[in-house]
């Protein structure tokens, strides 16, 4: 298969950027210019390449806005936002450049939302201890409305995505199909992690409950929005797919879209480490200090492993690999207390997996099919599974490179279960 980079990780992330082109997140010429200067496993060359393209796109956007070209300015601001997101992506979260470029990505995106066809609400959702969860509520323009009130999709970020990037899957497409899309960042995601150092939490149903309460309050205070709280779906990809299943235990969620989720983060980690050594540590035969030293040495010699370990420690709120792996045990659909999370899910579920054998993380055999079997409270008529092989069909993790097709399959599923009727064109 053709690759953009000899680095598996760089190739995946480049495909991720180019894959957003169908929704306005990338231009092929800008992509090729950036690609020309990126070196294998060299984060500085990645940074320089995307910084150049981000600043270029922002300049084009500013010029288009000054000239009164709404659509052209919007499109360029969207690309600039995505490129600024990519700029610092390969750095650890403690790098001084991460927050400034995240802020630039947000600023360009917010400028783009001012130029969109439908109304976009920038929201702050009350969470706990005075903390709010940031998000965008994309509303359908009047010409795209479907009969009745507006169905809602709550779309959660994953381990490394941002609420701005989420636009390029459902945020752009959903409103054009009559759906309201709430793209949000929870604890351990986006600036809540990078700036506030708030880690991920495994019981995402708690987070989802706060978001659902917010939607209820918003609907009561602004009835003119016509949000249909009887038709709320939850969606997420990879780690977000796990979060979507946890959120679906709330009866207010009426449909769940879980894209390439993991079943257990601990079990997933076992597929990516020397298992004999790992099990010796887990059983107490290898001291923490020895295990941490080994992991640190491995991280220094392997760029992808180092990046993943640093993100893992950051998102788990710990300083050592041993603490990270212990926290991984909490991120599961079958916690150690014996609770069977999936027994609490009764709504229709659309679940996907990567079938190409090129999965970045969770495989379909270890996660997707297992989850399908354990969703015993969901009738077969309300369970849909999609595990494509070819990259064009969504064979890569999180359906990278096939977001347009994923969006089509998602809204076909939601239309069916939310009884949205459309006319054949």
From Swiss-Prot:
GO terms for molecular function: hydrolase activity. Its EC number is 3.7.1.-. Disruption phenotype: Does not affect the production of xenoacremones A and B but leads to the accumulation of 8. Pathway: Mycotoxin biosynthesis. It holds the Pfam family FrsA-like. Disulfide bonds: none annotated. The active site is at residue 366. Keywords: Hydrolase. It comes from the Eukaryota. Alpha/beta hydrolase; part of the gene cluster that mediates the biosynthesis of xenoacremones such as xenoacremone A, a compound that shows inhibitory activity toward the PI3K/AKT signaling pathway and which has the ability to induce apoptosis of A549 lung cancer cells. Within the pathway, cooperation of the hybrid PKS-NRPS xenE and the trans-acting enoyl reductase xenG is responsible for the formation of the reduced tyrosine-nonaketide derivative. The alpha/beta hydrolase xenA then accelerates intramolecular nucleophilic attack to give a pyrrolidone derivative. Belongs to the AB hydrolase superfamily. FUS2 hydrolase family. Homodimer. This is Alpha/beta hydrolase xenA. It comes from Xenoacremonium sinensis. The lineage of its organism: Eukaryota, Fungi, Dikarya, Ascomycota, Pezizomycotina. The gene is xenA.
């Amino acid at each position: 298969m053709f690759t953009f980079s000899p680095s598996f990780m760089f190739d995946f992330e480049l495909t991720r950027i180019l894959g957003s082109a169908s929704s306005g997140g990338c231009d092929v010429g800008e992509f090729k210019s950036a690609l020309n200067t990126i070196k294998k496993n060299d984060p500085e060359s990645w940074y320089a390449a995307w910084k150049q393209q981000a600043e270029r796109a922002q300049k084009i956007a500013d010029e288009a806005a000054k000239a009164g070209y709404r659509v052209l300015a919007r499109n360029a601001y969207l690309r600039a936002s995505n490129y600024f997101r990519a700029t610092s992506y390969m750095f650890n979260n403690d790098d001084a450049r991460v927050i400034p470029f995240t802020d630039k990505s947000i600023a360009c995106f917010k400028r783009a939302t001012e130029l969109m066809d439908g109304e976009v609400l920038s929201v702050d959702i009350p969470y706990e201890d005075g903390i709010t969860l940031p998000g965008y509520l994309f509303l359908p323009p009047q010409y795209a409305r479907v009969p009745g009130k507006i169905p809602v999709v709550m779309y959660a970020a994953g381990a490394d995505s941002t609420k701005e990037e989420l636009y390029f899957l459902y945020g752009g497409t959903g409103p054009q199909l009559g759906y309201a899309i709430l793209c949000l960042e929870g604890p351990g995601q986006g600036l809540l992690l990078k700036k506030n150092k708030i880690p991920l939490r495994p019981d995402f149903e708690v987070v989802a409950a706060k978001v659902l309460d917010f939607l209820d309050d918003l609907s009561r205070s602004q009835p003119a929005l016509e949000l249909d709280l009887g038709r709320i779906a939850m969606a997420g990809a990879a780690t977000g797919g796990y979060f979507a299943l946890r959120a679906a235990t709330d009866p207010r969620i009426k449909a769940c879209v879980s894209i390439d989720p993991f079943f257990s983060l601990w079990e997933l980690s076992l597929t990516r480490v020397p298992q004999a050594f790992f099990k010796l540590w887990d059983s107490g035969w290898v001291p923490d200090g020895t295990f941490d030293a080994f992991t640190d040495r491995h991280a220094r010699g392997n760029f992808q492993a180092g990046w993943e370990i640093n993100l893992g420690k950051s998102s788990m709120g710990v300083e050592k690999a041993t603490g990270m792996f212990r926290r991984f045990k909490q991120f599961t659909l079958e916690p150690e207390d014996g609770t069977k999370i999936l027994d609490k899910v009764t709504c229709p579920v659309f679940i996907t997996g990567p079938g190409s054998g090129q999965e970045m993380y969770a495989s379909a055999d270890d996660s997707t099919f297992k989850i399908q079997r354990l969703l015993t409270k969901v009738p077969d008529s309300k369970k849909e599974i999609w595990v494509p092989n070819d990259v064009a069909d969504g064979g890569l993790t999180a359906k990278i490179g096939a977001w347009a097709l994923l969006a089509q399959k998602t809204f076909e599923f939601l239309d069916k279960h939310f009884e949205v009727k459309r006319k054949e064109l």
